[in-house]
Design a protein with these regions (language model features):
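N-terminal secretory signal peptides that target proteins for export/translocation
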Residues: 1-9
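Residue-level micro-sites within transmembrane alpha helices that shape
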Residues: 9-10, 268
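Bacterial N-terminal signal peptides
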Residues: 11-22
Length: 560
């Protein structure tokens, strides 16, 4: 590891506090993963070859499954298993159950993420299950494994990770990230007793509007009682009373490591910043909750203010406080000091720029043409700048108060029929204001649900700030100066002339947002989604200056 800069007075005080905390930390706050026979399945130097075979009708049905907007706030899974034959590195397995996976950003009908469940006899390398993520938001194929690497170094239970090339019915779907499935075999790697309660959070938190986003993987009734008890403890107005109630149910010291590590790797779409993509395990030995990362394919990327559904965090890079547990703990002065100390400790022990950059180079060479150079450069830039940015914030001390999260549920309701046309050119996303009237929008609702601009423009291109997604944006300036944006995110495999793309559920849609430009930077307010319709691409010339034209129609679902 590179030697850290010579510490100033503030850093020296943090170091002393860290040492003092180490002596009294809970026994389970620093996890080390046990060696396991299945480690061969996660050899980082080996790209697995996974070939899936199932009937064409089953494959068509599987790839099109997904959540509807009506059940976005539901904890019920929209996916079902199909029977397949799976070959992994030449080892063939019959009667394997396969299903689609994903909640929001990773959903794809062209390259769906997959879960494989093998029969009673163990699968390849002794695995019972395989989880294959499509890296829909990460064309570098780096972010997930790097995040879990740092989490593991921070003493946080984290899945093992490597890569796989996946084909279905002979069609090469490209490189996927292969991670541990979150079940008892994984829990045994870190916990003496794997029979406790396991929870998954997808837009889930310990507050009434978000409690339905926490799925219980074990005994539903008993687990719900525990969640209600933790919710009650977090609602106590007195800080001391709140902290005692939380400490009886959560290993706070272990949570500090998880919390700080999420900010360290820029996991804006995790628990602390977006109440999303997390697991937690209630250890039967002490009845306390331990948090674990999940779905970090948007980490190691520039953090933009208000990035993510429901995210209200300011520009701080060193701490996230949207999650209710994070927000309430941050109110306590002693916890803030411990958090600062823990973050500095992780910078000194778990954040090794040379090793991380070497890992980026190794994986990039291993995967070759399957990685996107622009996305790799983003990851490298994040690694090089994180320490200085975070230590600058720690040096001045974190503010005593941050913006409190809004507890309105992220649910959507159909309120308007919307249609429109666009005729623009490619590679024009840098435009920030109306320059031509290259689009038209009709918004039918009674009463009106938005203040519609009088004129619209359209831009199109590949957005590096959206993981190099192909986007078309229809935008108009209101008299107030705010900009209304309908932003279509399009699967690159479908971006071609003559394509008729269904807008349905959370796979293909347009985000409807309001932008307010301020001296400190743009403020983004999500309004809802345009879906349940169709996007028609008449002409697609995806080169700089090429023509992009078409039309759209659908239903606007308002976020409430």
């Amino acid at each position: 590891m590179l030697a850290p800069p010579t510490p100033g007075t503030h850093r020296f005080a943090l170091a002393l506090l860290t040492l003092g905390l180490t002596a009294c930390a809970a026994d389970r706050s620093d996890f080390t993963r046990a060696a396991d026979p299945t480690d061969a399945a996660f050899d980082p130097d080996h790209v697995l070859q996974v070939d899936v075979e199932l009937t064409d009708p089953d494959w068509a049905e599987l790839r099109d499954q997904g959540r509807t907007l009506a059940d976005l706030c539901s904890s019920e899974s929209p996916y079902e298993y199909f029977t397949a034959t799976v070959t992994v590195d030449g080892m063939r397995f019959e009667n394997v159950e396969v299903r689609k996976k994903g909640f929001f950003g990773s959903l794809s009908s062209a390259r769906p993420s997959l879960k494989l469940r093998f029969a009673e006899d163990l699968g390849p390398y002794g695995l019972e299950r395989m989880t294959l993520n499509n890296d829909n938001q990460d064309p570098s194929h780096l972010r997930t494994c790097l995040t879990y690497r740092v989490m593991d170094a921070a003493g946080v239970p984290a899945p093992r990770c490597n890569h796989a090339r996946v084909s279905v019915n002979g069609e090469d779907l490209g490189v996927f990230t292969h991670v541990d499935s979150m079940n008892k075999p994984f829990l045994r790697l870190y916990f003496e007793d794997p029979d406790g309660a396991l929870f998954e959070g997808q837009l889930g938190d310990f507050t009434a509007p978000y409690l339905g986003g926490i799925q219980s993987k074990t005994e539903e009734q008993l687990d719900r009682e525990f969640l209600a008890d933790l919710q009650e403890a977090l609602e106590r107005p007195d800080q001391g009373d709140m902290l005692r109630g939380v400490s009886a149910r959560v290993d706070v010291d272990a949570f500090l490591s998880f919390w700080a590590a999420e900010a360290l790797v820029g996991q804006w779409d995790g628990y602390s910043n977006n109440r999303n993509n997390w697991f937690a395990y209630r250890d039967p030995i002490n009845s306390k909750l331990y948090f674990m990362p999940w779905g970090p394919d948007a980490a190691f990327a520039p953090l933009r203010q208000n990035q993510g559904l429901g995210s209200i965090n300011g520009p701080l890079r060193s701490v996230f406080t949207t999650g209710r547990l994070s927000a309430r703990l941050f109110e306590v002065p002693s916890i803030r000091r411990r958090y600062e100390a823990r973050m500095q400790h992780l910078l000194d022990t778990a954040w090794d720029e040379d090793a991380l950059l070497a890992e980026v180079a190794r994986v990039t060479a291993l995967l070759g043409a399957d990685v996107a150079p622009e996305s790799v450069a983003q990851v490298q830039d994040y690694i090089r700048t994180a320490r200085a940015d975070i230590e600058a914030e720690l040096e001045g001390g974190l503010p005593a108060q941050l913006a409190r999260p809004v507890d309105a549920p992220i649910c959507l309701f159909a309120v308007a029929n919307v249609s429109g046309t666009f005729d623009t050119t490619f590679d024009t996303l840098d435009l920030t204001a109306i320059t031509e009237e290259r689009a038209a929008v009709t918004w039918a609702s009674d009463p009106p649900t938005v203040n519609l601009p009088q004129a619209f423009d359209a831009v199109a291109g590949v957005d590096p700030e959206l993981m190099n997604a192909t986007t078309i944006r229809v935008l108009g300036v209101r008299p107030s100066g705010q900009v209304l944006v309908l932003g279509f995110v399009i699967d690159p495999a479908l971006f071609e002339s003559g394509a008729i793309i269904p807008l349905g559920g959370l796979t293909n849609f347009a985000a409807v947002v309001e932008l307010t430009f301020r001296p400190t930077g743009p403020l983004l307010r999500p309004l809802g989604l345009l879906t349940d319709g169709v996007l028609t691409l008449d002409v697609v010339e995806p080169v700089s200056g090429g023509r992009i034209s078409g039309s759209f129609s659908g239903v606007f679902y308002e976020q409430r």
